[in-house]
Amino acid sequence: MTLPVVAIVGRPNVGKSTLVNRLTGERVAIVHDQPGVTRDRTYRPSFWQDRDFLVVDTGGLVFADDTEFLPLIRQQVVTALSEARVAILVVDGQQGITAADEEIAQWLRQQSLPVLVAVNKCESPQQGLAQGAEFWELGLGEPFPISAIHGNGTGELLDQVVSYLPPTDQQAGEEDIINVAIVGRPNVGKSSLLNAVVGEQRAIVSPISGTTRDAIDTLVERDGQRYRLIDTAGIRKQKNVDYGPEFFGINRAFKAIQRAEVVLLVLDALDGVTEQDQKLAGRIVDEGCACVIVVNKWDAVEKDSYTIYDYQHQVEQRLNFIGWSDHIFISAATGQRVEKIFERVHLAAEQHRRRVSTSVINEVLEDAVGWHSPPASRQGRQGKIYYGTQVSSQPPTIALFVNDPALFKDNYRKYIEGQFRKQLGFRGTPIRLLWRGKKVREAERKGVLVRDR
């Protein structure tokens, strides 16, 4: 990552994620009154006084608990601090200093970076000074009374933060970044895949379903191309999800699909294609994203020379409505074929952004109509395609101007889409055909009437 990092740390439920949302101007980190909601490192861009930087939210630090996740969370915090230029220790001004705050402060004093103390939940500026004064005892310098919810005092805190940051370098534009969402059912190996791709334990990996709750962004670069990888909460059937942090994480996962240009749909090779996989694929189609189907845990499958073909057939049968997607069989645990994912993602993004000239589109249409004319209606009306033109990309969208859209039934529309794919490719991306009525004389005036051969 090229931008400087500001790490947010503290014990559970002091308002770290609320502060991240305040500093970055968007509600991305999950906020809930259940302690320990944030487990992984989540990065978000921020800007203050001509400085661009990333704010990293971390899990709540607890030193005196044997819960399985806590050693993993501590490792995530250590990694975040190793990346950071400055850390913000968030404490609760209403509760005052706790033993946990003192323990964390002692640990932070051993780290080789500046630490600022943000005394949160100081809703009154007058009382905030008194609430903040107590935290001088932590030995980390002047406390900053703030209200993450209302924004009080955050400007002064940011002024001090940016004093530790270098001037902003010229950054490549957002249009150069390919957004890639990693989605799938719980425990199919999404976080393991992210870690294998990045080369570090970026997201917490655990055999317990639902470990990842936030959508987590990681910027990586391969062969000169930058990718933003978004690891998401596993998506289960709605009836199995309580209206707590996991519910919000699933909503975040759906929003991650909306943000993405390419989606990696991760399947578990041991489970095959499930009903929930089909629903996820349907969401990807609805959002118009490019897609690469990643079959994980391939190393655990007993194989013969036909296994991969049988599995591909199953994928094509059960996910036939997303049959244009590319497939790759990997093992995130062993790293098998993981590096080839970037090649597939790059090709899918290229096709997703692709534009085709009007002349080429009409050559395809002329051939298609010549091979298979539009069927006539029961009343004898013949469907006619006058011309087509691409009106947008991401995904490629082609408007077809016809005499009456009602004359073109689903099977013929699928035939036309198939001809575009056969002659032009579009592997890895959906294409959308817009059937529009147009009078014959208008088409003839343009001189682009598609005729039967």
Curated annotation (Swiss-Prot):
GO biological processes: ribosome biogenesis
Residues that coordinate or bind GTP 1: 10-17, 57-61, 120-123
Database matches in Pfam families: KH_dom-like (PF14714), MMR_HSR1 (PF01926)
UniProt-listed SMART domains: AAA
A molecular function (GO) term: ribosome binding
Residues of the KH-like domain: 354-439
Subunit structure: Associates with the 50S ribosomal subunit.
Protein name: GTPase Der
Species this protein is from: Cyanothece sp. (strain PCC 7425 / ATCC 29141)
Gene encoding the protein: der
